[in-house]
Regions:
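N-terminal alpha-helical targeting/anchoring segments
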Residues: 1-136, 154
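TRNA-recognition modules of translation machinery and tRNA-sensing kinases, especially anticodon-binding
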Residues: 131-427
Length: 427
């Protein structure tokens, strides 16, 4: 949720960020108008409260309290009633009041972009930061992962469709073993980098989804149980970020570094006709997520470290990739700055996203009320939250199939993975 104090202090920055995202910036004027209305109502309530307190004190100091009370009571009652109405009205207009128009605007306004984010409207204007590895040159025409997997009997899309419909896959034999091995490999790397492993619930409340910025903006993309009002997580970012919701952390506890391996569930409602074959875009997929809770002044350094943790996994798996800084129009609703890691896919002769690493600054923490107290006498302040995949398991698996394929259709796995799989080749 956007910080009302930031909009008050620097409305031009909020306008500029919106325009850079390709959004009409007129909402900033509406926020300021509603905020002025709220502060005017608050000032009126405070003025009436002061008058009420003054009259009460006057009665208390009178020599003849009974006479003073009889004389001033009608006026005191009238002011008290007016104050109660004014106070109720001001509270209803407050930026943190449920149902207030001001809160609704702040909730549906994307995060303020960091100044380092480049201008641009779409993915073709993202900026290359660095690249690692050299895409393999094949002596034969490389096949897509779904053809390789079906021929090897490790990916079964036909039976998955029989069970669940489109955008599902059954992993079999060494395919299922490879998925499990990747999860262990990623979790071990995260543990070595200082992350605490969490096994969170896969169903979360509406409040949890809202607190991490998934609702109401992305409600159409979620699988939910309306009767129980529970949502299947679209990413472990949701329960990991909200884990410390409503808490005040000690400064010494920061940064909090969490990781989880979970299935994730998404409707992919806006992806009709895109990536209809294979593992790229599934309704259910596995992922290892990294989440940081950081001191505000450290969060952009933390983003570099989190991104480096995700990159290290790709390097150990010997997968060529590139790191892209997302442009303004491609940066997500919650994020102030995002790096995408894109892995090389030979069959497409292009790079595809395998991880997205974001600094959400205080945007999610403000919703979830995650704060830090630096000093016993200091006022708590919101932490900054960061998240990234390290990595998406299905997309890593398909990248391994495509990049490790041999002319005979077998797959050679990277050396770092063999202790986890127990085999170095799928044939």
């Amino acid at each position: 949720m956007l910080d009302i104090a930031l909009v008050r202090r620097d409305p031009d920055r909020a306008r500029q960020s919106a325009r850079r995202r390709g959004i009409d910036d007129s909402f900033v004027d509406e926020i300021l108008r509603l905020d002025t209305q709220y502060r005017s109502a608050l000032a009126q309530a405070e003025q009436l409260k002061a008058q009420k307190n003054q009259l009460s004190a006057q009665i208390g100091k009178a020599a003849d309290k009974a006479a003073a009370a009889q004389e001033l009571r009608p006026r005191l009652d009238a002011i008290s009633a007016a104050f109660a109405l004014a106070d109720e009205g001001a509270r209803a207009l407050a930026p943190d009041a449920l149902g207030s128009p001001l809160r609704a605007l702040l909730e549906n306004t994307p995060n303020i972009l960091d100044d380092a984010v480049p201008d641009g409207s779409g993915s073709d204007e993202n900026v290359l930061v660095r690249a690692w590895g050299t895409p393999r040159v094949f002596s034969f025409e490389p096949k897509p992962h779904y053809e390789l997997g079906e021929a090897l009997g490790i990916l079964d899309f036909e039976r998955a469709a029989k069970l669940s419909g489109s955008r599902f896959c059954v992993l079999r034999n060494k395919g299922a073993q490879l998925q499990r091995a990747l999860a262990r490999f990623f979790l071990d790397r995260a543990a070595a980098a200082g992350y605490e492993e969490i096994a969170p619930p896969l169903l979360v409340t509406r409040e949890t989804m809202w607190s991490t910025g998934q609702l109401s903006k992305f409600s159409d993309a979620m699988f939910a149980d309306p009767e129980a009002d529970l949502f299947m997580i679209p990413t472990a970012e949701v329960p990991l970020t909200a884990l410390h919701g409503g808490e005040i952390l000690d400064a010494a506890a920061l940064p909090v570094k969490l990781t989880a391996h979970t299935p994730c569930f998404r409707k992919e409602a806006g992806a009709a006709g895109k990536d209809t074959r294979g593992l790229i875009r599934q309704h259910q997929f596995e992922k290892v997520e990294l989440v940081w809770l950081s001191a505000p002044e450290e969060s952009f350094n933390a983003l570099e470290r989190l991104t480096a943790d995700a990159e290290a996994a790709l390097q150990e798996l010997e997968l060529s990739y590139r790191t892209m800084l997302l442009c303004a129009g491609d940066t997500s609703f919650n994020s102030a700055k995002t790096y995408d890691l894109e892995v090389w896919l030979p069959s497409a002769n292009s790079y595809r996203e395998i991880s997205s690493c974001s600094n959400c600054t205080d945007f999610q923490a403000r919703r979830a009320s995650i704060r830090v107290r630096r000093d016993p006498r200091a006022k708590p302040e919101f932490v900054h939250t960061l998240n990234g995949s390290a990595l998406a398991i299905g997309r890593t698996l398909l990248a391994l199939l495509e990049n490790g394929q041999q002319a005979d259709g077998s797959i050679v796995l990277p050396r770092a993975l063999v202790p986890y799989t127990g085999f170095e080749r799928i044939s």
